[in-house]
């Protein structure tokens, strides 16, 4: 029996990379996994399905949900479906993130908006959708993936740095609003 047996974890941006590693680790500790990722083509859809099968092979229930985490209404619908499918959401990991690096003087508005929408707005969207569920359950954890760049900045990454600084402030504020029932750390 693992540390997370009987729990349901929702991990955003988990078809690959850090999100996949988090989902795999939680599954190895017994958590059932719901994960999301953006699917724009057949290769991405195949990656989503391959990750689902890999996680499920660890002996837990796993479902993959394709969608745009930066879309508020789509996120609300996805979380409602996940809650219906699993019966609870005990852990939310806000991992979805991108970079579109460039010096600020050359950065387009589209580069700025894309990074802030995926990295910060998606976290707000999922927190907004999952918080009522966790409060009704009287427990939960919302883990936010931050970065040292959000504290110190980084040349060529003003959009990414701003998104991660926002993530840090969001986590601190949400921890004050939802605590002590819901634990809200940032990594």
Show which residues each predicted segment covers:
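Residue(s) in the substrate-gating loop at a strand-loop-helix junction
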Residues: 147
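Active-site helix of classical SDR
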Residues: 127, 163, 171
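Helix N-cap/beta-alpha junction loops of NAD(P)-dependent oxidoreductase domains
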Residues: 99-103, 151-154
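Short-chain dehydrogenase/reductase
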Residues: 2-86, 100, 110-111
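Active-site loop-to-helix junction immediately N-terminal to the catalytic Tyr of the SDR YXXXK motif
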Residues: 107, 153-161, 173
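Alpha-helical segment proximal to the catalytic Tyr-Lys
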Residues: 132, 176-180
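Substrate-binding pocket helix/loop in short-chain dehydrogenase/reductase
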Residues: 103-104, 111-116
